[in-house]
Each structure stands twice: as C-alpha cells, then as structure tokens.
Amino acid sequence: MGKTKNLTVEITGMSCASCAKRIEDTIGNTNGVSESIVNFATRKATVTGRAPAEEIYKIIEGLGYGIVKEETPAVSEREIAKSEWKKFLVSAILSVPVFAISMFMIHFRFSDLTQLVLTTTVIFWPGIGFFKNALKQVMHWSIGMDSLIALGAGTAYGFSVITLIKGGSGLYFESASIIITLILLGRFFETKAKGKAGEAIRKLMDLQPKMARVIRDGTEKEVPVTDVQVGERLAIRPGEKIPVDGAIIEGWTSIDESMLTGESMPIHKEEGDKVFGGTVNTTGLIYMTAENIGANTVLAHIAKLVEDAQGSKALVQRLADKVSGVFVQIVILIALLTLGGWILAGYQFNEAIIPAVAVLVIACPCALGLATPTAVMVGTGRAAEAGILIKDAASLELAHKINTLVLDKTGTITEGKPRVTDLFNINDEKETAETDNKNGLDILHIIGSCEQHSEHPIGMAIVHYVREQGIDLEEVKDFKAIAGMGIRAIYNESTVLIGSDKLMTENNIDVSELKQKAMEIKDESKTIAFLAVDNKAESVIGIGDVVRETSKDAIQEINDMGVEVVMLTGDNEVVAETVGKEMGIVSVKSNLRPADKCDEIKEIQQSGKIVGMIGDGINDAPALATADVSFAIGTATEIAMEAANITLVKGDILRACEALKLSRQTMNIIKQNLFWAFGYNVLALPVAALGFLNPMIAAGAMAFSSVSVVTNSLRLRRLRL
C-alpha cells in the first residue's frame, strides 16, 4: 500500500449501468480504496485510495470485464460505432429474409431450414458478442443488459430449434434475429450519440498544432510539438497556432484566445506577454520562448479538468444507480412470473413464451445509466467552450439551486489592477492624446517614455494607458526608481520626476495648484502621482481600480434570474456604497476582513439560502471555501485554483451568469432523462407482460429508449449562453 492517489482506467465490456454499478461496488469494498466511481457513459473508472493499480485491474478483469492500459491505444467512440454499424448491416441483411418468410407466410420446400440457417448465422456472428458477455457475466455471478438480450433472443431461438426438430409449428426465428438486429442498430446510434457528447475534450486537444517552428543553431526547423523543450525559441507566423505555453520575446500581434476564454475579440500581445498553446496568432510574426509543454500547458490542464468533471457523478444519479444495481434481476423475475402467469391462465408454453421474451428485451437499464452522465458530459463540455471550467458534476448540479450570489469587489466587479483614470495638467484641463499643455509639453509622451522601464504596478499602468492612446515611446536617460516614492529620468535634456507628494516635497517642488484635484482623486480611493518637469509641477495623475465593462449588465441579468446579489468588500464604506449604487446592488457590506466575509456567508446560509461566492481565489479563499458553490475569477494562467468549484477563465461576472443558466438547463435535461428512463420501464414492462407487444417491437423500443436519452442530452450543445 502506497500513498493516496487517483487512478483512472478505461473499461471494456460494460453493456449497461448494472455492469458499472457492480464494478463500482466491488472496487469500493476493496481494502485501501476510499472512493470508487464508474461512469457507464465514459466507460471509465476513477479510483481514489492506496490500493495498487494492478490490484484494481485484477478486480475488474475478475468480474469479466476488460481494461485499456496506458500503453494500449484507446478505442474511440467513432471506431466502436463503425464496428457496431458493420455488425448491424450483416445482421439486417440476414434477418430481412427471415422476417419476410415469417410475416408474409412465404412457404417453400426449405423455408423453415432457411430461417434456421440465417438466424443461426445472426446469433453466432454479429450477435455472438451478446452471448459471450452474458456467459462471462454468469460465470462471474453477475448479470447485465447483455444477459437480458441473450436470454430473450436465445429463448426465442432455442424454442424454435426444438420445435423445428420435433416437427411442430409456431417458429420464432424472426423474433430472435430481429431482436439482435434492432439492438445492434440501437447500440450504433447510442455509441455515435455518446461520441458527440464527449466531443469537448477531443476538440480541446485537437486545438494544439502537431508541428512547431523551433530556432535551433540559428536555423528555423519544423519539428513535432512533442519534441519542443522548455526554453527553446519558437517562431509563429500569422494564421498559425501557438504550439506551447510561453512568452513573446520579439514582435507584437493579436491573439485569438476564444478557445480559452470564450471571448471572440483578439487580444493585443507584445514582448513579455504570455501566450498559450492552441490559441491563434492572427496578425504579426512573433518569436516566443517555450515555458510549459505537454501536460503542463493550460490547454492540457483544461482538458484534464473537463475529463475529471465528466467522470464524476451528480448527487441525483444515486437513485438511478440503486435501481440499476437490482434492475436486471427484477426484470428476469418479472419475465418468469409472466411465463408462469400465462401458463396458469391456460395458455400453451409456445404462447406464454412470447410475452416473457418481450419483457426480457424491452427492459432498458441503459437509459437509467445514461440519463445523468450524458447530460453532465455535454454540459461540462459546453461550459468549457464558453470559458467556464466546472470541477465536478456535483458543483454543476448544486449551482442551479443558488439563490444568493456573493461578490467580492476588487478583482471581481472591478478589474483588480491599476488603471489611469484621471490626468490633469496645471490648468485643470484634462489631458488627452491629441492635446499638449500650454507650455507645449506632450504630457502623455513624457510620462509614458519615462515610466517604460519601471517595474512598479503604477508605472506599468501609466505605460499601458499611454500605449493605448497609440503613442510611440522614446528612450530616456538616467532612469532611476526611487523606492516608495516614484521615478526620476532625463527626457529631452529635461529632468522629469513622477511620483508621490513626498517626492515632490523632498525636491522642493510646489504642487499647491494641483492639490484640490489631488484631493478629489484621493476621495475616490485612488492613488495619485504628480509630474514635474525641470522642478515645475505640470500634472497630477489618478490611478485606480476600474469597474469591468460587463459587471453592471451581468449583475442585472443575475437579478433577473431571481438570484439576490450581495457585495462583501474590505474597502471603505464610501467606495463600497458608490460601486454598489452604480452596479444596482442593494446589499453592500464594507470594511470586512477575510474572516468577516466567512461569517457573513454563514449568516446567509443559516437563513436557508444556497450561497454562491465569486472571488479572485486568493484573498477570498476562506469565503470561497465557506460558500455552497464557489466561483473563481481568473485568467488563463490562474485556472488551477483548487479552492473553486467553478473557474471563470475570462475573469468576468458574465461567465458566472452563464454558468447559472447552464446549470439550470442541465438539471432540466437530467430530470427529463430520468423521467423518461423510469417512466419508460414502469410502463413498458407491464405492457409487454400483458402480451400487447411483439418481441420485435419490444426490442426496437428498448434500442431507441437509450438513444432518446443521449439525444436529449445533446440539446445542451446548442444552448445559447
């Protein structure tokens, strides 16, 4: 026994939810296993604990199922569907003549023998898999969907063979062959639909290019992306995808990051900016250095998060799992009671066998097993496309119950980083990119050029603001950062100071004419910086945290959904009330420490509310952990926030609104699926037992019941967020 770890293994041979439930329970009862989840829809088991992988493999194989180890190439849903289609075609070609002979009473010399030969071929060629799996299940004291199919088709076939040998009438070869044919057709559609449900992960991984242009020994070489090493220099031309995560070291461009954030507008990138594998370089030639490769890239991490979420179980699935665990046994009991009841009612065995077979083949535990996981698969995949990463199915499920949403201010409602908000010259005139002050000084050009070498957040905010105005910067001389106060530089032979009032005072610079504006800016809880040129004060700059463009609309939409919005912030009351009023938030609490936020959330929960919390995942970690559902506002570089149930990659409250919509619609789909799955079986079994359904019709109904569940789940792919 080693340390606790997670093991994910792909399982082959599962035919229904009963199989998955049996494997899950057996592994879960193994010493050293703390949790076992087997997902029938994804064909994967996720095991948490200290039990060795080889022991888990032996348990699965001991139950009669196969495993796909890491060194074995995984079989895709597309390949499985292709195999099922071939089996169906063979079965259909052989079954049509049998059906025609029986239904249209076509009699010729060897008509009965023809039915025997064709049906035998169907049973022992395309249909042999059902019987092999059923035999394995019986040998391991387990029965599943394949057991029901084999028992139903086998009973009809066996009875017909015995009747033919005895020279009697009333053959049911067509029932046996058509049952196999329709089930194979249903399996084909089901597999194809399940493949579509799991397309999100494949689409994500397909985003990464196969090749990369690496600069080695001064020469550009095209190599497989798997050969790229950390620290290597890469070239990316316009229209090409970024191969791995890294930083731009030369050039500038616009990057389409929609696959990460869901944001359609390209993002401007220049030297020093981070770029991520799978995103698209839309305009300029850039050179970058590789920083994260393989499984360490953002793209790979997102794919892993989505895969983990799709493999988890929603709480609502527990009832379906319990029913699935005993479903097949109950169906066999009902079939035996049906057979006995018809015989006791005075019918012959050859008449009583038909409703019994219909009961066996119409039952559908698959629909029960697929009702929840397929909706979760499609829902989490659709969320990832929109830049919403959901940790597990339980989070997706609980989010639809949220009726109170708590927001932090800084970094959630606001951008969380300094921006230039005010710029006034000595004459109280607002400076713009197009105007100079009365002395002919280009204020923007001065402050941008002088601050371009600053590593302080305020200096970088000033440079960002100036560059946004489209102004080119020039080099300055004798740049010096003055700790805690600002910077000094020589611009066109003039001495420039940018910084605090303390810096101005120490250099005997009079800022009295700017004091009023400075106080107005300070009253808005913003930081101020003065500009002095040749010992004369010229401007005051206001730097603050600005509200995100989408925050107000998002909060309004959340309110319209019937969810109360509460703002909890550590900022002072004046700032908090101002932002709250601007955003239309009625309930605002200010001057709160992290522990205070937790207490506020607990108080809301005690009133019976389900609380969601949106924060930046760092200072708000305690509050995020206290909430029923936590949303982490982040960027592509912060998606590993373990504290959050849901990560909003774009860093936008609007994504939280979309997550709530998706959660509600996913739960609606799950409820519809479960209603259909339970309702179908509750109604179908007695109808079949009473003799109202031919086994062939029963087989068709069963085959398409699971298909309907998966197809309903696929509607989430078209959900507009």
Model region roles, listed by residue range:
Residues L89-F99, L319-G346, P355-C364, L370-V376, ...:
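Bilayer-spanning, highly hydrophobic alpha-helical transmembrane segments
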Residues F104-H107, M139, G158, I162, ...:
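Membrane-embedded alpha-helical bundles of multi-pass transporters
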Residues M1-T114, F124, K136, K203, ...:
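Flexible metal-binding regulatory segments at protein termini and peripheral loops
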Residues E54-V75, E79, F108, D112-Q115, ...:
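Actuator/coupling domain of P-type ATPases
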Residues G2-T4, K21, S34, D436, ...:
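Conserved ATP-binding TGD loop and adjacent catalytic N/P-domain core of P-type ATPases
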Residues L260, I354, A367-C450, Q605, ...:
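Conserved catalytic phosphorylation-site environment of P-type ATPases
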Residues N403-E455, M485-V566, I646, N712-L716:
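ATP-driven catalytic headpiece of P-type ATPases
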Residues L135-H140, K192-K203, L207, T374-A393, ...:
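Juxtamembrane helix-loop transition segments at the membrane interface in multi-pass membrane proteins
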